[in-house]
Amino acid sequence: MPLHIDAVILAGGMARRMGGDDKGLVELNGQPMIKHTIDRIKPQVKEILINANRNQTRYAEFGFKVISDEHSGFLGPLAGMLAALGQTKADYLLTVPCDSPQLPMDLVERMLNAIETKGADMAVASNGEQEQPVVLLMKPSLRDSMEAFLKAGDRKILLWYAKQNYAVATFADQPNAFMNINTLEEKQQFALDQT
């Protein structure tokens, strides 16, 4: 029986570096940035959730369930991950940011392979030089650990997953796959690079 893998696209942040604009809805090459992410991960998972704390109606137009953080106050990506872990019945949950339009088409396959090779509970993606802490594949059983971490007042993903049994899935062959678009300048540069 094949594994059931769901994904959550994290679009719940404040987007300070994007001038406060909701990053997932910012146009990139003629379509909202989140649409690029959806197109990359949809073939790899069973269901997609979108974590958003504003503009939920607009996000719902993409045809996926929209969930908000369980805790108020824009507590960062872990809060969105926690909300998704409470919604999924999957064997694994993939977490990705809404502002990475070039995610690998073999992301889930390679992350799952890293988990199985190490016997880990989760995997974090790496571009070969640094880990990408928002790009995780994890077992939903990690929810209690994540919730306790947040309740203790911690928010840094790196500190949380460092306490877990995790593997690293390396994508050195795709070094630009995890490029984030955080500013209007980066958006303009990405558009130029695509022409």
UniProtKB/Swiss-Prot annotation:
Entry coiled-coil feature ranges: none
Short name of one Pfam family: NTP_transf_3
UniProt superkingdom: Bacteria
SUPFAM superfamilies documented for this protein: Nucleotide-diphospho-sugar transferases (SSF53448)
Residues holding Mg(2+): D99
GO biological process: bis(molybdopterin guanine dinucleotide)molybdenum biosynthetic process
InterPro entries found in the cross-reference section: MobA-like_NTP_Trfase, Molybde_CF_guanTrfase, Nucleotide-diphossugar_trans
One GO cellular component term: cytoplasm
EC number: 2.7.7.77
Cofactor (UniProt): Mg(2+)
Location in or out of the cell: Cytoplasm
Keywords tagged on the record: Cytoplasm, GTP-binding, Magnesium, Metal-binding, Molybdenum cofactor biosynthesis, Nucleotide-binding, Transferase
Family: Belongs to the MobA family.
Subunit structure: Monomer.
Biological role: Transfers a GMP moiety from GTP to Mo-molybdopterin (Mo-MPT) cofactor (Moco or molybdenum cofactor) to form Mo-molybdopterin guanine dinucleotide (Mo-MGD) cofactor.
Name this protein carries in UniProt: Molybdenum cofactor guanylyltransferase
Organism from which the protein derives: Shewanella putrefaciens (strain CN-32 / ATCC BAA-453)
Top-level taxonomy: Bacteria, Pseudomonadati, Pseudomonadota, Gammaproteobacteria, Alteromonadales
